[in-house]
Amino acid sequence: MFAVSPSSFSPTTISPRRSGQRNEPRKFSVVRAGAKRILYGKDSREKLQAGIDKLADAVSITLGPRGRNVVLAEKDTIKVINDGVTIAKSIELPDTIENAGATLIQEVAIKMNESAGDGTTTAIILAREMIKAGSLAIAFGANAVSVKNGMNKTVKELVRVLQMKSIPVQGKNDIKAVASISAGNDEFVGNLIAETVEKIGPDGVISIESSSTSETSVIVEEGMKFDKGYMSPHFITNQEKSTVEFDKAKILVTDQKITSAKELVPLLEKTSQLSVPLLIIAEDISAEVLEILVVNKKQGLINVAVVKCPGMLDGKKALLQDIALMTGADYLSGDLGMSLMGATSDQLGVSRRVVITANSTTIVADASTKPEIQARIAQMKKDLAETDNSYLSKKIAERIAKLTGGVAVIKVGGHTETELEDRKLRIEDAKNATFAAMREGIVPGGGATYIHLLDEIPRIKKNLMEDSYEQIGADIVAMALTAPAMAIATNAGVDGSVVVQKTRELEWRSGYNAMSGKYEDLLNAGIADPCRVSRFALQNAVSVAGIILTTQAVLVEKIKQPKPAVPQVPGIPTS
């Protein structure tokens, strides 16, 4: 039974004593903190660096077309993977301070995955080099805060140059190049993503699922994606991806704020009886109701997630109507006097699949609602042709794009579970890189872009003349810029320093192709990176590097050493 009373978990409140009230003895809760291990200054940074190096070493071997795989053993499963963020998140070191360093670098991978969906390995390599060079400078007397400021200013200017030199994606070949590179030079994946994007257009959505066969196929279905994520991370069902994933979910669509859990009880009990999840799309939900839903979700009584209404003002109502139509739900509008208290399960919509991240929600429509969707699209196209209002035209066009773009479901197959999981990760990276490239364009790949950005460092340093330590920050970033190309070359069995030197002599578009072993125009050769991924890698790397370089002490829990066993003497019993 769904529990609506929060009393079992509501915090205890303390009321002031009234006049004449008997003074009860105060009760205190004693919290015993574990013993801490403390390291200061250089020692703390060296320990953190050791953990960072161990994680970065494990991840960097996967970079580039000649990168290696990593075997990941977890409980009863063995995975062979080439995905930076998966490797990074799986690493836990026995030394607590080293593990703290590794955990900080894991944040780079997680941020990259959330912001760009790819480039985690590059970001980790950049961060490691910034931290290593920065720690050395600080050990020799450089001011940590000034060094950090210099690094931040340098990266800010490099990002501006990067965006200025970015080239818009032009056609299927560019998409194929980006997707192939991101998938570890897998041309099958590159072709798959390019053909899929061609079917659904730049506004479409790609969903990735496991196939029941060894074949990989693409099905285009009706669906929609909007920019609102889950209201609580406690709704997450896929911990690895930090996503909520529902199959055959029921959907409640309303523009009202939910302030009482009693409004939801009949719907929650019905979906629980049917063993189907419930997605609630609402204007807002009170903290108390959200807490009740989370507690019941944790106890396994319900399977639910809540997202806020997408859109702004008038556009919000139209989007909710489109979602209701697409899912076959009744749009429970407060303006029309429709109360949530009297809502029934018949007013809920249906979906084939729902995927919710921290920032977005994707709904794949059930086949039963397809005729209604097509009819709505036809009506909106008629409205678009008849309106002279430029603002309305834009909004109607956006709604049409959301409904017509559809959702391409890539059903990934493999002969073994290991092959299937590896291919899914590669396709996921390729998908994310492709949409990033379509948003902000492409730059030369293979680490060449970062090497060519070295030409900007002298100019940037001139603007940092007031503070010599800030100039050191610029030099630290310059040292880090060569690291991705060095790692790619090393994995290909080539001297990285030679690759860096020769690439610096070439023009912007050119660099070393680790697949062919040639120095050439990388964009013509199909070696391209999304500008969005390249800039986020720099920004996320310098962010965590700045935190670590300005760290002066580390406190971690002491590991309790087991007491030595008492040796047993023959003939004398032990107590």
UniProtKB/Swiss-Prot annotation:
Q: List the disulfide bonds.
A: none
Key word Chloroplast present: yes
Q: Which CDD domains match?
A: GroEL
Q: Which InterPro entries match?
A: Cpn60/GroEL, Cpn60/GroEL/TCP-1, GroEL-like_apical_dom_sf, GROEL-like_equatorial_sf, TCP-1-like_intermed_sf
Question: Where does the transit peptide lie?
Answer: 1-32
Q: Where is the composition biased (Low complexity)?
A: 1-18
> Which stretches does the entry tag as region Disordered?
1-27
- What GO molecular function annotations does the UniProt record carry, in alphabetical order? ATP binding; ATP-dependent protein folding chaperone
In the UniProt record, does the keyword Chloroplast occur?
A: yes
Q: Which SUPFAM superfamilies match?
A: GroEL apical domain-like, GroEL equatorial domain-like, GroEL-intermediate domain like
One GO term (biological process) = protein refolding
Its function, per the record, reads: Involved in protein assisted folding.
**Which protein are we looking at?**
Chaperonin 60 subunit alpha 2, chloroplastic
Q: Which organism is it from?
A: Arabidopsis thaliana
Gene assigned in the entry: CPN60A2
